[in-house]
């Protein structure tokens, strides 16, 4: 089965270069506020899609188990170094378009700073919905093409694409901005009900960061995030959606799903997970399950 192209951070120093060494403490803190407002305080199991090096994972303190998924094994290795290898964390290298989880395996999921790398966001959202139980919570962040900066640039004829057109814009290879209404439509089509929207990162421009202290910027952003219910004009938008409709049938307690044959009976063995249906063995190396390439 062919899948859309994948944006891989394999071997990347993204966490260090983009977050640790760059001036993005403001973005990090306002995203943390949005997550607190949208996620349940506690839960049995959380699916973190696009977990990367685990920047947000420590914020999910109320969940008993967190399953970190990323296409990049090296990003997950960094997450392991940050979080450890205890039973609370499960590390999974996987393709978002072929997630290795049984239907209804999770009561909650997040996807932060990840959808903007999806060439087929609708297919990705359908995969998320299949893994969530009916009534489950999904917190999604996406890059908003209809933000004030892009509107101004378009009005001044400094960019060719319209921020009001609902089609995604690919401003760099496998980097997309999305229209808020398009994302809302995709979520509904995937059997999600939108519950809340937050506008985040109002003051991302370097000018604001030079003029105001970090605490003031964070406080101001926190005060106006609620405006996402009225309009979405910030570069980042957070959405809380609820899984609705009927779940796919699955045996009670099923967790894994073979990406190759869709079998739901996978057994632990020393070197990985063996599918009882197609007999493939999905490898487990140094505490990281790898479902990216189909083994022979």
Labelled PLM ranges:
Residues 47, 51-98:
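Class I SAM-dependent methyltransferase SAM/SAH-binding core
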Residues 160, 185, 196-270:
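A C-terminal cap/extension of S-adenosyl-L-methionine-dependent methyltransferases
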Residues 110:
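A conserved beta-strand element that flanks and buttresses the S-adenosyl-L-methionine
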Residues 1-42, 75-78, 139-162, 292-296:
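Conserved class I S-adenosyl-L-methionine
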Residues 161-182:
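Acceptor-substrate binding/catalytic loop of class I
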Residues 122-137:
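A short glycine-rich, Lys/Arg-flanked "PGG" loop and its adjoining helix->strand segment in the class I
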Residues 113-117:
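Short catalytic micro-motifs in class I SAM-dependent methyltransferases
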């Amino acid at each position: 089965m062919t899948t859309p192209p994948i944006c891989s951070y394999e071997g990347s120093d993204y966490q260090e270069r983009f977050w640790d060494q760059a001036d993005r403490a403001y973005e990090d803190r306002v995203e943390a506020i949005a997550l607190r407002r949208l996620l349940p305080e506690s839960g049995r199991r959380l699916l973190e899609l696009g977990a990367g090096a685990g920047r947000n994972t420590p914020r999910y303190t109320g969940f008993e188990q967190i399953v970190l998924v990323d296409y990049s094994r090296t990003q997950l290795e960094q997450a392991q170094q940050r979080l450890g290898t205890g039973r609370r964390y499960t590390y999974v290298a996987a393709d978002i378009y072929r997630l290795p989880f049984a239907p209804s395996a999770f009561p909650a999921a997040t996807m932060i700073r990840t959808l903007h790398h999806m060439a087929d966001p609708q297919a990705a959202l359908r995969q998320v919905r299949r893994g969530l139980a009916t009534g489950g919570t999904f917190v999604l962040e996406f890059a908003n093409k209809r933000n004030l900066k892009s509107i101004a640039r378009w009005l001044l004829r400094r960019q060719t694409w319209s921020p009001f057109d609902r089609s995604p814009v690919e401003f760099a290879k496998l980097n997309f901005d999305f229209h808020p209404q398009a994302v809302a439509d995709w979520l509904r089509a995937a059997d999600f009900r939108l519950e809340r929207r937050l506008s985040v990162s109002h003051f991302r421009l370097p000018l604001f960061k030079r003029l105001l202290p970090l605490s003031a910027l964070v406080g101001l952003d926190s005060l106006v995030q609620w405006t996402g219910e009225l309009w979405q004009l910030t570069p980042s938008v957070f959405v809380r959606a609820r899984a609705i409709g009927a779940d796919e049938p699955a045996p009670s307690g099923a967790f894994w799903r073979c990406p190759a044959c869709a079998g739901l009976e996978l057994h632990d063995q020393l070197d990985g997970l063996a599918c009882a249906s197609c007999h493939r063995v999905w490898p487990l190396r140094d505490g990281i399950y790898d479902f990216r390439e189909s083994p022979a």
